[in-house]
Each structure stands twice: as C-alpha cells, then as structure tokens.
From Swiss-Prot:
Pfam families per the UniProt record, alphabetical: Ribosomal_L18p
Keyword rRNA-binding: yes
Gene this protein is translated from: rplR
UniProt name for this protein: Large ribosomal subunit protein uL18
Lineage per the UniProt record: Bacteria, Pseudomonadati, Pseudomonadota, Gammaproteobacteria, Moraxellales
Gene3D superfamilies reported for this sequence: 3.30.420.100
C-alpha cells in the first residue's frame, strides 16, 4: 500500500507525462506547510521562465501559509508570465488536491491573465 507522499508523487508523474506530450508551457505549483511556490516552465522542461513564491520580498511580510497568500502568488505569477509573453499554460498541481491554497493560486492566476 502506498503512503500519502508516494501516491501524490505517482499522480504528479502521470500528470507531467501528459503535459509533456501536449508540448505547452507548464505552471507548476508546490506547497509546504509554510510557503507556496509557482513556476512557469518551458515546454522542453529545461528552463524556468517565471517564478513567484511567498518568499518574494513583496509577499514575505504578511502571512505566508494561507489562502490569501496563495492568491497573491497566483496574481504575481500571472503578471510575470504575461510580461514574459506567456498567456497559455497547463496547470501542474504536482499531485496536490485542487482545493484550498492550490485552488486559490489557480483562480488568481486565471483572473489575472493566464489561460489554462
């Protein structure tokens, strides 16, 4: 039987293989209990084109492990992505449930110009 982390990593691996087959930019989300991170990665997978996290100087002053902070990261990654000329991405939630902080980040990114 799988433990929780192994099951999450298995889901993430399947999702990444599917996105790689599509050949589009990928918005990757990683979360820890204290912070949330987002990166836009090139279709080849070898280059990070934009990144944002609660460790950024503009977001570090507030709370970093809640839904509001995740929404702020979503807004920031959308702004940085559109300034880099990226509007269409595939959402890679890294095996995490589409709920809570992951959902808040995705919704904020959509509202600020990224298309999933």
């Amino acid at each position: 039987m799988f433990d929780k982390k192994a099951a999450r990593l298995r889901r993430a691996k399947k999702t990444r293989a599917h996105i790689r087959h599509l050949g589009v930019h990928r918005l990757v989300v990683n979360r820890t209990p204290r912070h949330i991170y987002a990166q836009i990665i090139s279709p080849t997978g070898g280059e990070v084109l934009a990144q944002a996290s609660t460790l950024d100087a503009s977001l570090r002053s507030g709370a970093t492990g809640n839904v509001d902070a995740a929404a702020a990261v979503g807004k920031l990654i959308a702004e940085r992505g559109t300034s880099a000329g990226i509007t269409k991405v595939a959402f890679d939630r890294s095996g995490f449930k589409y709920h809570g902080r992951v959902k808040a980040l995705a919704d904020a990114a959509r509202e600020n110009g990224l298309e999933f």
